[in-house]
Amino acid sequence: MGRVTAKALFLYNDPIATEALLGEAFVDAGFDVHTFEVVPAERAHFPARDVTFPDPTNYDVLVPLGARWPVYDDALRRTWVGEQMTMMRRAAAGIAILGICFGGQLLAQTFGGTVTRAPSPEIGWYDVESTDPLLLPGGRWFQWHYDSWTLPPGAIELARTATASQAFLLGRTLALQFHPEVDLELLDRWLADDEVGEIAASGLSHDELRSQTSIFADDAANRVRRLVHGFVTRVVGQPCPSS
């Protein structure tokens, strides 16, 4: 019999928050990439809805991606955010999880940390200092978030910016606050959806963000591959917790 290919499931918590560079890196690492749409485009302005999530045990890795909403929103916690938290608890017994921005905050909230509004947002390319560069390369990573987490009990912080925690490891779960997946194409989708002027309010322009991304994205793409390699070898490769 041939070798069974590992499967990674990317959860589209927002219709414009897709896997981009991160999906390419998982394919390069030998994974079949699958996706699941949590909030479809037609519900983006009314995102509270019940969702029946796939069985997490059918996958080797779950990747909950970003979203424009706060994970602590009451209407969302009563619907799909709460349902996704249940999925993550079930998955954590034997499946590796990589949470991205909103997805990382969801993991913090799921496993006993807190998520609240940060004193100031981080939007653009920020220097991230890593305490474990073989697992999580430091350097300039893209940010677009207004909230921040406190660590869940037992979690190990792996990275920070000057103002916020950026990554933690908890068993076979790795949470990231930044966006390793961003390339110019994905950024343009986000900028096209910037209806309320979040970028201008942060003191930047769309052109400035595009220019920064043109400068930093190629180096970030190389670090994304290293990040996925470290995640696959160090986190996915960990023994599952005993039942």
Residue ranges and their predicted role:
Residues 10, 53, 116, 130-243:
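Amide-donor transfer/coupling interface in amidating biosynthetic enzymes
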Residues 6-26, 37-39:
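N-terminal beta1-alpha1 ligand-phosphate binding loop
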Residues 20-21, 73-75, 107-110, 152-153, ...:
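Short glycine-/acidic-enriched loop or helix-start segments at secondary-structure transitions
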Residues 88-114:
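Catalytic nucleophile loop
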Residues 6, 60, 139:
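Nucleotide donor/acceptor-binding cores
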Residues 27, 31-98:
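Flexible gly/pro-rich beta->alpha loop and the following alpha-helix that scaffold active-site loops
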Residues 116-122:
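Short, electropositive alpha-helical surface patch
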